[in-house]
Each structure stands twice: as C-alpha cells, then as structure tokens.
C-alpha cells in the first residue's frame, strides 16, 4: 500500500433527527489538533436527509470541508446504506484517518467499514496523538481497564478509531471560520439492503444522559442499599449534580 496517497482526517458526523450529536463535535475538535500536526485538513462526513444546513455548525467546530451526503436511503440510520456510502467515500477520497463516535451507531458502523475496507479498527479509544513518523497513536483501556494500550495501524489505511463520548473536548465554536461544502452522490446497491424501518417509537423516560452531566455523584457497592443512594441524591442536589452508579449496583437493581 502506498500510504502517501492517503491524506486528511475524516470524522463521521453522527446526527439524530437532524441534531448533531455532541460526540461529533468532540471528534471534530480532536481531528483539528491531529490535522494541524499533520498539516492536513479536517473533512466532516455529514450523512442524512435534509441535514445539509448543519454544515456551518461543523465548520465552526473545526471542519475545513463538509461532504454533504444526502439521500432518502440515509434519512434514518440503518447499517447497509451508511456502510455503502462511507465505503464509497473512502475508496474515492482515500482518508488517512477516520474517527467515529463509540456510540451504539458507531459500534455498529465502525467494524463493518473496517472489514469492507480491509483495515484495522481500534475501538473505544480514550486518547489520540500523532507519532514522529506521522502515524496515529490510538490509546484505549485493556485488560478490564488495568492497562492502557497504545495501538498503531502501520500497514493499512485509513487508520480507524472509535472514541468514547465525553473523552475529547469540543473546541469553542468559531462562527468566523471559513470552509467548503461539497455534495457527494452515492451509487447504492439496493439489492443488499436487508432492513427497512417500519415505525419509530420513542421511549418516554425521565432519565438524564450522564455523559451530558458536568458533575456526577457516583456510588458503588459501598453505598449498600437503595436507601444509601438517597444520601447521594441529597448531595447531588446541593452540588447541582446528577447521580450515577457502578455497574454492580445497576445489575443488582439498586439504581
């Protein structure tokens, strides 16, 4: 593989119902740092239907170019249309790096792209940097979080990584930034589509997304009982925080 043909840092922009997800803005901020170190550009992949107007938000967040990929097939996320679209872009544009949020969508999409392209994927990264040789250094927890492993994809491109939400810091939006928006047409092979969305029902729940919280008060087995969590809730109210718990407490049904 001639790695010199592969340039720029690409970010898959996850949007839901036309709303750009925070993890995408966080990845654009990190992509900006990586691209500056490589003297390359940040390219945002904006897939969907009727979402092209989000391009200015992405440019303000750090993108140099927004590839607007609009199609009826992309109106809602399903695996095959999105995988086909991004695979086509990778073959045509040859990105050096592709970053994807480690969300339910990203964890579905990333491995499929990796398999189709024939490159590696480092999942659930908590750190990204550029080596002296210009390779992407991808750091992730290993062995249950007891070790941190730094992984390099030396022989294949693009270098792919999924990144946990809330790990990277989004840059302050700069509305004065200038960028370019390009329309991209995808040639879908609809014979491979296996899933059709018949109806979407949104779950009604009074829960807070703790990844969006600025302060957390968290408890584990030491709290003991549901009554013990009431003390944590009182503390959280004083601090203006949200309450969270360890996996053991959630599995036990205490929270």
Where are these regions (language model features)?
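N-terminal glycine-rich FAD/FM-binding segment characteristic of electron-transfer flavoproteins
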Residues: 1-255
